[in-house]
Amino acid sequence: MSRRYDSRTTIFSPEGRLYQVEYAMEAIGHAGTCLGILANDGVLLAAERRNIHKLLDEVFFSEKIYKLNEDMACSVAGITSDANVLTNELRLIAQRYLLQYQEPIPCEQLVTALCDIKQAYTQFGGKRPFGVSLLYIGWDKHYGFQLYQSDPSGNYGGWKATCIGNNSAAAVSMLKQDYKEGEMTLKSALALAIKVLNKTMDVSKLSAEKVEIATLTRENGKTVIRVLKQKEVEQLIKKHEEEEAKAEREKKEKEQKEKDK
């Protein structure tokens, strides 16, 4: 029945749905997991890398995380070629604003500008929506550290912690459970990101080569965007595994004591 309504982007189904937009969202559901967490002293992006070929030159290739300007970065989930077009557009919008007003573009304004383009692709015939969701992290003088998410329909929102991609529902419920508002430091946010990725990624054991993490902080009045080196990610994973093992031991000891009673 739906085939009559899903061949074109602009046709509504009898239930008032745009199937092509929903199919674009479906493409994101199969992409690698990306999550963002807002902390008091910074904000981070963590993403699952799927293309981990050992011959890949990582100097020229970033699968998941892209720097947009001095104050913003983004992570993508979905069709990578679509993501490249959108990240280039984001950089152009940011540079035009800087040239015109001699100051960096506010985070939300950049997100809104891109979402207007995304929305246009759901409204005009002969085009298809971009099969990409983005997480944006940034800092501006108006609202400080910020985290935004946008989807193929052009819809966007500000978040304290969120996830897109594969197993995002499970990741969001974990974040909801473990996110402590007002108490999150970047250090605890990194530990939480590793914990969530460990539970939601479709791998038996989490490895540093499959994870990409970027942090955004402020130092001496300037924004610093850092992509964590593989060794740093390895240390975070190792620390998480040690804590998991410790918690498991304590649980067993507690159960044993209860049995002895």
Curated annotation (Swiss-Prot):
Residues 240-261 are annotated as: Disordered. The keyword Phosphoprotein applies. Pfam families: Proteasome, Proteasome_A_N. It comes from the Eukaryota. The modification Phosphoserine is found at residues 13, 75, 173. The keyword Cytoplasm applies. Belongs to the peptidase T1A family. The 26S proteasome consists of a 20S proteasome core and two 19S regulatory subunits. The 20S proteasome core is a barrel-shaped complex made of 28 subunits that are arranged in four stacked rings. The two outer rings are each formed by seven alpha subunits, and the two inner rings are formed by seven beta subunits. The proteolytic activity is exerted by three beta-subunits PSMB5, PSMB6 and PSMB7. This is Proteasome subunit alpha type-4. It comes from Homo sapiens (Human).
